[in-house]
């Protein structure tokens, strides 16, 4: 089992947990949590880039920026949209890193 596999799945799980706990109705808490997510994400990019495509990395970063803007603007509809997209993208990265017959072929 690859160390990068373990690292990526651990970080995506932590990012997903933080993203799920975001609450747009509490702007200061939302901004603090997004800052925590962003710091973890930026710290993780070098190891992610060893096996995750730059397209996926860029998409995660862009979605996080959009989520941050929705939080700042208290736009609940956009906030929920980008939160769902970020969680789905994190799940996709995690799935791509799993060992399976589909990924091997």
Annotated model-derived regions:
Residues 27-28, 76:
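TPR-repeat structural position
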Residues 55-105:
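Structured, soluble extracytoplasmic/luminal domains of envelope-associated proteins
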Residues 30-73:
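Extracytoplasmic/periplasmic/luminal assembly and interaction segments
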Residues 4-22:
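Alpha-helical transmembrane signal-anchor/signal-peptide segments
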Residues 21-25, 70:
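Hydrophobic side-chain positions on well-ordered alpha-helices
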């Amino acid at each position: 089992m690859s160390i990068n596999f373990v690292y990526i799945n651990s970080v995506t799980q932590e990012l997903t947990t933080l993203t799920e706990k975001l609450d747009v109705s509490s702007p200061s808490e939302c901004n603090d949590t997004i800052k925590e997510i962003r710091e973890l994400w930026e710290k993780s990019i070098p190891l992610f880039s060893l096996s995750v495509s730059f397209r996926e990395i860029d998409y995660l970063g862009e979605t996080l920026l959009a989520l941050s803007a929705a939080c700042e603007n208290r736009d609940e509809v956009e906030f929920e949209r980008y939160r769902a997209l970020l969680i789905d993208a994190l799940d996709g990265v995690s799935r791509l890193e799993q060992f399976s017959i589909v990924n091997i072929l």
